[in-house]
Design a protein with these regions (language model features):
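Alpha-helical transmembrane segments and their immediate juxtamembrane cytosolic regions
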Residues: 2-360
Length: 360
């Protein structure tokens, strides 16, 4: 296991930061914003490009983020125990560190929304605020899981791997209630059950790392075959992200398919581990890893703010911000610009209001 001098697992740091950056780049590159009489409306090329949904099996990385987060929380708690820190203080410190910047950002945008609506009498400004803040939903789930950490740790000590089996079974039961018996409200229980399962799986990270390589390959193929079977059962959509216009999403709320995706991604990152650990030992890659870990969370928090600024400048300079539907060749060729533009607008926001931080 590749570690820094301080004992950190560099591959864990890489996975956690990379998962946030993948989310950011996906939002920048694959959001098609249309202006309607009611205000801005976002859609995606997934609804117009046949077969593109298969990419979401690799780039929907939230299961991996929660998995790595579970491992980090367990390791951090063990270090806190050695210092004599109580579980209440530990949980509160982590909630405060994550919630404070998110709440400040939300407050600023709500204030901007109220001011613009009052000054210019434009109701659409609230749609802008919702679009900018909507990616923060998963931080809310993450905060709930941190608050539930005492229960999760107790389950891990008391029941070990049975906790994962029970959570997986509960996620499947929720889908049965939802799709077989029509209890749509039950699906929202999976916001905690499915993401809680991913987080709980992270407690087994070191055991998974210690397994022989054939088990890594087994996890990868088990997850992949489960994904194929579930998607082609006709019950679940193929995309691992929401697609505008489809009546069912695997993400809102999450379905049992996300459990299969989690298994697939755990297997994949373990299969890639030897190569990536060798790469992360190189001085240049060490610097890259350190840099993205310092900036990943601020970049995630402010990336939609930067995108809003970039779109505002585009409207000011060119008089239009609407993306083409369906996306054509020109739209695809513009994707590098769609990434670089918001990035250049986000970096000053991070410099002014964000605080690059090291992963805890």
């Amino acid at each position: 296991m590749s570690q820094t001098v301080s004992g950190r697992d560099k591959y864990v740091d890489w996975l956690r930061a990379l998962s946030l950056i993948v989310v950011v780049v996906w939002h920048w590159a694959f959001t098609i914003l249309q202006w309607t009489p009611q205000g801005p409306s976002a859609t995606s090329p997934l609804g117009f490009t046949s077969g593109l949904w298969i990419l979401t099996w690799l780039f929907q990385v939230l299961p991996l983020f929660f998995y790595v987060g579970g491992h980090v929380h367990l390791m951090s708690w063990q270090r806190a125990c050695e210092r004599g820190v109580g579980i209440g203080a530990f949980v509160w410190r982590r909630i405060r560190a994550l919630a404070a910047p998110a709440l400040v950002l939300s407050g600023v945008w709500i204030g901007i929304g109220a001011a613009v609506t009052w000054a210019f009498d434009v109701a659409w400004m609230w749609r802008v605020v919702v679009l900018v803040l909507s990616p923060l939903w998963f931080l809310g789930v993450y905060l709930v899981l941190i608050a539930l950490l005492p229960i999760a740790l107790w389950m891990h000590r008391r029941f070990d791997v049975l906790a994962l089996i029970w959570l997986g079974g509960a996620a499947l039961v929720v889908d049965v209630l939802r799709f077989r018996y029509g209890f749509e409200w039950a699906g929202w229980l999976n916001m905690i059950i499915v993401w809680g399962l991913a987080h709980q799986s992270g407690f087994f990270y070191r055991r998974i790392v210690a397994l022989p390589r054939r088990y890594d390959v087994g996890l990868l193929w088990t997850g992949l075959f489960a994904l194929i079977g579930l998607v082609y059962s006709g019950i679940y959509p193929g995309s691992m992200v929401g697609v505008p216009g489809e009546k069912l999403s695997n993400m809102a709320p999450p379905t049992f398919v996300i459990v299969a995706l989690l298994v697939f991604q755990i297997g994949l990152v373990e299969v890639l581990r030897p190569s990536m650990e060798r790469l992360l030992e190189r001085p240049r890659w060490k610097r890259v890893n350190d840099t993205i870990n310092r900036f990943a969370l601020p970049l995630f928090l402010f990336h939609t703010t930067g995108m809003a600024i970039a779109l505002g400048l585009t409207w000011w300079l060119f008089g239009s911000i609407g993306g083409r539907i369906p996306p054509d060749l020109t739209w695809w060729l513009e994707r590098p610009i769609a990434i670089v533009g918001p990035l250049l607008c986000t970096l000053p926001v991070i410099y002014l209001f964000g605080r690059p931080r090291k992963a805890a």
